[in-house]
Amino acid sequence: MKNQITIREAITEADIAVFWGQLHTYHMRDIFPDSEDENRKHFLDDTEYRAQIQRVHDRQQDRCYYLFFHRNGQDIGFALPAIFTSEDGKCFILEFCVFPAFRGSGTGRTCADALLSWAKMRGARYAELNYGGDERRLRFWKRVGFVENGADEWGEPLMLLPPADPVPFTVEVLEDPDDWQLRKLENGFKREIGEDVLTS
């Protein structure tokens, strides 16, 4: 079907190399344009960020996926989601990009919808992401249906696409003061009441 956006996984060595090349370009162009930004150095260092992501990609359960958005015979963007089926079915969108030449005319929204449908077919019940505090990204994800959802353990703002269906939940006692889930809850509360978030 012409103009239909599909998702294809980068599986071959060549596809994975292209994926990481595009991800590095995205980080330099869109996320960390300041070449002196310490975060940029971390995300472009294959011994740090890539090695960490590769470990998540290679595990048997709750893994991440290197994906391309594909339309009319060419890749038009990419995504890096992780689906936690052993937990509560969360799809965490680590990275999402529509290549600049293909932005506009609702392409980003269509890619986001395709990604969320793809994730649902693989067991995702809801989605979450970090939008980095960028107002443009905040507006985009709100149009997709996400709502602001506190902050992560590093104080970065999160967004949540609530589940369409009821999600079973469990209760457990979190006793470790360094537990990331406690930090996330505390940061979400502090952010809501206008206080500085806790950082590691």
Residue ranges and their predicted role:
Residues 128-138, 155-156:
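Conserved beta-strand-loop-alpha-helix junction that forms the acyl-donor binding cleft
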Residues 92, 123-125, 145:
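Short loop/turn motifs at secondary-structure junctions
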Residues 95-104, 131-132:
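A short, internal acetyl-CoA/4′-phosphopantetheine-binding micro-motif in the GNAT/acyltransferase core
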Residues 5-89, 94, 99, 112, ...:
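Acetyl-CoA-dependent GNAT
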Residues 142-151:
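Conserved acetyl-CoA-binding loop of GNAT-fold acetyltransferases
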Residues 110-126:
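Conserved acyl-CoA
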Residues 164-170:
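Short, charged/polar, Gly/Pro-enriched secondary-structure boundary elements
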